[in-house]
Design a protein with these regions (language model features):
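Positively charged, structured surface patches that bind polyanionic biopolymers
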Residues: 1-93
């Protein structure tokens, strides 16, 4: 059975790794996801975090846990990692 976008998001936000992150990182993830383009990309992750009064360092937490992936470092573009899995985050760190 193919998972839908909602099912994938639910898998992510109910994962142990996600739930152990700071509230700022959790909120930033949801807002970045909501405000990204159709490919899940944005060049403003820190501005989005700041706009919701989350610590801009929460973006670093999302990157460290592989919930966000840098697509273009020079342009500052990140992508929401839609292929994220609990085991994946642990093996990649």
């Amino acid at each position: 059975m193919k998972k839908t976008k909602v099912t994938l998001l639910l898998d992510i936000v109910t994962s142990e790794t996600f739930m152990l992150m700071s509230r700022d990182a959790q909120a930033a993830y949801l807002q970045i996801n909501a405000r990204s383009d159709s490919k899940g990309r944005t060049n403003r992750p820190r501005a989005i975090a700041k706009a919701i009064c989350a610590d801009p360092a929460s973006v670093d937490e999302l990157l460290a846990n592989r919930f966000l992936v840098v697509v273009d470092e020079e342009m500052g573009i990140v992508e929401v990692n839609k292929a994220w899995e609990e085991d994946y985050s642990r093996t990649q760190l």
